[in-house]
Amino acid sequence: MQTYPLIGIAGNHRQDNTEEDRYILSYAANGFVRGLEKAKAIPVIIPISNPEFAKEFISRVDGLLLAGGQDVSPLLYGEEPHLNLARTYPARDAFEIELIKEAYRQHKPIFAVCRGLQILNVALGGTLYQDIESQYENISVKHTQKTMPSQPTHTIQIASGSELSRVLGTTTPVNSYHHQAVKQLAADFVPVAWSTDGIIEAFESKSKDQSVVAVQWHPELLIEDSNIMQGLFDNFVERV
């Protein structure tokens, strides 16, 4: 009988403020669920919890997916908040950092998207541009698109020989919904994709002992119209 890997999606919270319902909801974006299902994996949400539970959560899944969401707190990398910093969620930051550390200890593959890339970099000692429009001198690409999310709006260049290039080739168009980005890349990682203005759009692990692919765009919003972006989910499940 065929078995399917269990993938933990690090979840987020939202507040339902309707008259009938005033609950805090734990959720994961449906694009991640669909991408994993199409790749023949079983998605489960890992709700934001006590960081002490991270070891147990990671022990029960075969891989960790880090999703998008709030800005990462700059206090985690020794900076004060910039005037253009958006909403942060320290409890989510703390929990996901422990999930990342446990995934490393247990050698579980990681796929990180947008904020997921950013918290992964910070968790291992990297830093971020808190707001690229005001802090990154060479910006010349719009990284917060107004076009519908299923449509790519700028291109990236990908390092040949990288895991990412096996899936996407050496150049591809992507969508873009971020105002933060990698500034100093953590020593454990190697950059493998860049926008035309030099922003790091993806990185991978230097070590063969830890499988990591992290991307700055949102492939989960492109998979219905792009088989090539579904390939990122297929690749993740293959790495499990």
State the predicted function of each range:
Residues M1-F111, V122, Y129, E133-S165, ...:
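N-terminal beta1-alpha1 cap of cysteine-dependent amidohydrolase-like domains
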Residues C114:
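Conserved G/P- and acidic residue-centered "switch" motifs that form tight phosphate/ATP-binding loops
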Residues L117-L120:
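Hydrophobic, aromatic-enriched interface-forming segments
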Residues V213-Q216:
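Active-site-proximal beta-strand elements of phosphoester/diester hydrolases
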